[in-house]
């Protein structure tokens, strides 16, 4: 696996988090609302930033869609906002980091490590498949929902 670690400080629901990945398949488990999807979205944004025309802050804004497209909206509001927020994604031979604060507008984060990130991950392909899309392809799931055998929120529809 090209990605080896993600470190988050004051980002969305996280005060401080460091996750090291094992080679092969990694599985994120946890209750609803603990940030599993946020981790996957940040990893996806970092992987997409290996393209020279795509920046880490831009792709992060595009996958989270914060109010007014402001990256600063992703700073954890319960944390000490004077420190701002940071994300670092690492691979075997490179890392890329992004720092921003509540005052950061649009995509104006400080990014370090972009050049080495692009060079090392240039042949990487990544895809993000939302859980809803996986569920919608499950055989006979729509019938089970319609009959009330399985209950999903209103975001699930076919």
PLM segments and residue spans:
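Phosphate-coordinating catalytic segments in nucleotide- and nucleic-acid-processing enzymes
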Residues: 7, 49-158
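Pre-Walker A-like glycine/lysine-rich segment at the N-terminus of P-loop NTPase domains
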Residues: 1-44
């Amino acid at each position: 696996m090209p990605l080896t670690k993600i470190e988050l400080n004051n980002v969305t629901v996280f005060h401080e988090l460091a996750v090291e990945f094992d080679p092969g398949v990694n599985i994120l488990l946890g209750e609803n609302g603990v940030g599993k999807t946020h981790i996957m979205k940040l990893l996806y944004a970092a992987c997409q930033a290996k393209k020279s025309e795509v920046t880490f802050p831009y792709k992060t804004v595009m996958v989270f869609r914060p109010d007014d497209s402001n990256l600063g909206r992703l700073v954890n509001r319960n944390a000490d906002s004077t420190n701002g927020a940071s994300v670092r994604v690492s691979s075997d031979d490179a890392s890329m980091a992004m720092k921003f604060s509540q005052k950061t507008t649009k995509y104006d984060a400080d990014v370090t490590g972009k050049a080495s990130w692009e060079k090392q991950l240039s042949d990487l392909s990544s895809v993000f498949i939302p859980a809803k899309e996986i569920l919608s392809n499950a055989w006979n799931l729509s019938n089970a929902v319609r009959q009330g055998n399985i209950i999903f929120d209103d975001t699930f529809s076919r």
